Regions:
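Basic amphipathic alpha-helical segments that dock to polyanions
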Residues: 19, 30, 41-54
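Extreme N-terminal segment that seeds HTH/winged-HTH DNA-binding domains in transcriptional regulators
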Residues: 1-27, 31
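Glycine-rich phosphate-binding loop and adjoining helix at the ATP-binding site
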Residues: 105-110, 114-126, 134-194
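Gly/Thr-rich phosphate-binding beta-strand-loop-beta motif of the actin/hexokinase/Hsp70
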Residues: 65-106
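Short glycine/proline-centered loop/turn elements that form peptide/ligand docking sites
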Residues: 4-9, 23-25, 40-43, 47, ...
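Conserved phosphate-binding catalytic cores of ATP/NTP-utilizing and phosphoryl-transfer enzymes
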Residues: 56-80, 178-195
Length: 195
């Protein structure tokens, strides 16, 4: 039974790789691109429609037979919460952005603080998470040295020498990625300009 589930997951990944390119797809196009049967493609699309991962767009132009249905990724299926911590001359800045699957900002909130404490950060984070968005992943960019959630050197003194990942995991359920701000910029540059 495990091999059947593994094969199903592999097939779902093939379909997702196509749909996550942001284009509109027909069932026939997906079946051709992935080399999956029309029946398998239909079953996967039905499951994705039911879970609201994709949405029906329209019927495509007919070539003489029945019109094919067109599908695309549902942009609000999942969201990413991007958090940037930044120290200014006299204050600490917390920048929160909720981003949909088409890389559009659906919510943005900037906070400023004189102390920049972990407690302030958690309070702000919980407030943003209450917005009811489908946040699946939180990506935290901070000005400091980070190793598996442990912050060594950091412009936010109160966060320094603390395992911020463990602190966050106790408070929130979403997957958390923490990275140095320069590394985040490099990753972003790669995906925007080279990918």
């Amino acid at each position: 039974m495990s091999k059947v589930n593994d094969l199903k997951q592999e097939n779902e990944i093939k379909i997702r790789e196509c749909l996550y390119d942001g284009q509109i797809w027909t069932k026939n196009d997906l079946a051709y691109k992935t080399s999956l049967s029309l029946a398998t493609t239909t079953n996967i699309l039905q499951e994705m429609l039911k879970s609201r991962e994709i949405e029906y767009v329209s019927d495509s132009m007919s070539t003489g037979g029945r019109k094919s249905k067109e599908y695309q990724l549902y942009k609000d299926y999942k969201h990413l919460l991007k958090i940037v911590l930044k120290k200014n001359k006299k204050s600490y800045e917390f920048i929160f952005e909720i981003i949909d699957l088409y890389d559009q900002i659906v919510y943005q909130k900037n906070y400023s603080s004189l102390k920049g404490t972990v407690e302030e950060f958690l309070k702000m984070l919980k407030e943003v998470l209450k917005k009811g968005q489908e946040i699946a992943v939180i990506c935290l960019s901070l000005p400091g040295v980070c190793d598996q959630g442990m912050i060594d050197l950091c412009d936010f003194e109160d966060i320094q020498n603390k395992n911020i990942l463990e602190i966050l995991k106790k408070e929130i359920k979403q997957k958390i990625i923490i990275e140095n701000d320069v590394n985040c910029a490099s990753i972003g540059f790669y995906f925007v300009f080279l990918f």
